[in-house]
Design a protein with these regions (language model features):
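Active-site-adjacent loop/helix segments that line or gate small-molecule/cofactor pockets in enzymes
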Residues: 2-92, 109, 129-131, 141
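Generic structural signal for well-ordered beta-strand positions
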Residues: 104-105
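Acidic surface patches and DE-rich sequence motifs
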Residues: 98
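A structural motif shared across PLP-dependent enzymes of the aminotransferase-like
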Residues: 86-95, 112-127, 137-146
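Short secondary-structure capping/junction motifs at helix and strand boundaries
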Residues: 133-135
Length: 146
């Protein structure tokens, strides 16, 4: 099964999509040179299989309704037109796969520090005990970072 075919369970869900992502021909052309793209699709397929029973009827909803359901109860201080028009399901490096199966290239915003989504080095560092302090509290981890 090709990595594109692994997106079928996500893409065959009913509901209007807001985000289409990159077309399959482009994704196929990029796959050999971007292993994180394939890893993102694999992660999305696995995560979808894991949450499918839990999300149930939400999967059939329009993408806008899914967005609203995910953010229900949160205060989002961004303007409505600045909220991304999808629910992110999984990501690796700069590649994001939406709940509706769109694949996007996201080079990141604040907080990613150039590492992308789900960076192995950051996850490994976070798996060890860390002093939870900001810049006002000098710590060994600050020096290690530089």
């Amino acid at each position: 099964m090709s990595f594109i075919e692994r997106l079928a369970p996500l893409r065959t869900q009913p509901g209007t999509r807001l985000t289409t992502g990159l077309d399959d021909a482009t994704l196929t052309a990029l796959a050999d040179r971007h292993p994180q793209l394939v890893a993102a699709v694999d992660a999305a397929a696995a995560e979808f299989a894991r949450v499918q029973g839990e999300l149930g009827p939400l999967l059939a909803q329009d993408e806008q309704a899914q967005i609203e359901a995910m953010q229900d109860g949160f205060v989002n201080f961004y303007a409505d037109d600045a909220v991304t028009p999808y629910v992110a399901l999984a990501a690796r490096g700069p590649w994001v796969v939406t709940l509706k199966g769109a694949v996007l290239y996201d080079a990141g915003g604040y907080g990613m520090l150039g590492f992308g989504h789900t960076p192995d080095a950051v996850l490994e560092a976070m798996s060890r005990p860390q002093v939870m302090a900001n810049i006002m509290t000098p710590s060994l981890s600050q020096q290690r970072f530089i």
